[in-house]
A protein has these predicted regions:
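Structural motif at transmembrane-helix junctions in multi-pass transporters
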Residues: 30-35, 78-96, 111-114, 164-171, ...
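Alpha-helical transmembrane segments of compact multi-pass small-molecule transporters, enriched
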Residues: 41-46, 94-109, 121-124, 178-182, ...
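Membrane-interface interhelical linkers
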Residues: 1-70, 74-88, 135-146, 177-227, ...
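Selected transmembrane alpha-helices and immediately adjacent juxtamembrane segments
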Residues: 140-172
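Hydrophobic transmembrane alpha-helices of multi-pass small-molecule transport proteins
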Residues: 44-47, 101-108, 115-135, 259-278
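N-terminal hydrophobic targeting segments
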Residues: 64-127
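Hydrophobic/aromatic positions within or immediately flanking transmembrane alpha-helices
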Residues: 12, 36-37, 65, 92-93, ...
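Residue positions within transmembrane alpha-helices of multi-pass solute transporters
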Residues: 17, 21, 74, 98-102, ...
């Protein structure tokens, strides 16, 4: 393995661990929506400062960033509710796995992507893993996780378009800014201003660290895809579903260690086949 590919491998695996870590923090939070709000708000402020410092290019196409921020709001609401309802080792793998699959289907429908026979096999395998995970979950819990996955797919498609028509780095920064804005607006309209202010005063450091972790996860993936094929990086990145299955069953004491880890591995295998078929 060359030094460049090794660097990409380490970056992608680190991103997987970091993404699983901040989701674990959200799951363990007393008020999960508030935790996600604080995380996205601090990331959004940081993103805006950096974007202004480096300069927003003339002719920047704003609508994808705004649309992505709005979709991320619904993703955050759905994710918080799903973590309230279901186990970590069920919600996360179903949401991430279904999100990747729906994004692949959406790419065919809306972005002129094409599915090869191997990609179809990968989708079938991943769907099988998701069915195994959902089979022993309450219907409401499984549907909530699938709802999260639909928003993952939706913002992934919008961001794919947005990164193609804009500078990818500045666009990524402004996604966080738009998400923080819409999430804050939602909280204010829901009458949670006092809770938000109190939480920011007492937990600003944790919010900032979680926000930095969220942003850093994205940047690690961006750096990795410059050094290795996108499919290779994506497959490693989605290894987080196995990490979460292990953490949920071993660290959080959730039931079904072998079944959930096995099903998560099947989801990961399907995603690996999917990206290998590109």
């Amino acid at each position: 393995m060359s030094g460049t590919v090794l660097t990409a491998t380490l970056l992608a695996l680190a991103a997987a661990v970091l993404h699983a870590a901040w989701n674990l923090w959200v799951k363990q939070s007393g008020d999960r929506w508030l935790a996600l709000w604080g995380q996205m708000t601090t990331a959004g402020i940081g993103g805006l400062v950096i974007a202004v410092a480096v300069g927003i290019p003339d002719g920047f196409v704003w609508w994808p960033a705004v649309a992505s921020g709005l979709i991320h709001l619904y993703y955050i609401v759905a994710l918080a509710r799903s973590y309230d309802l279901a186990d970590f080792s069920v919600t996360y793998p179903i949401a991430r796995g279904s999100g990747a699959l729906l994004a692949a289907a959406g790419g065919v429908l809306f972005l002129d992507d094409h599915l090869t026979p191997l990609m179809v096999v990968g989708i079938a395998v991943a769907v099988g893993g998701i069915i195994l995970l959902a089979d022993h979950a309450d219907n409401a819990h499984a549907l909530a996780a699938l709802g999260v996955g639909s928003f993952v797919a939706f913002y992934s498609l919008v961001d794919s378009h947005g990164s193609r028509v804009n500078d990818g780095h500045v666009y990524a920064l402004l996604i966080f800014t738009a998400t923080g804005f819409f999430t804050t607006l939602h909280g204010l309209m829901a009458g949670r201003r006092r809770e938000m202010v109190a939480a920011m005063r007492t937990s600003w450091l944790r919010f900032s660290l979680a926000g930095a972790a969220s942003a850093l996860t994205y940047w690690m993936v961006m750096l990795a895809v410059r050094r290795a094929p996108v499919g290779y990086v994506t497959a490693l990145r989605e290894s987080s579903v196995v990490i979460v299955a292990l953490v949920g069953t071993r660290y959080l004491g959730e039931d079904g260690l072998r079944r959930r880890v096995g099903a998560a591995c099947i989801v990961l295998a399907g995603l690996v086949i999917l990206v290998a078929g590109r």
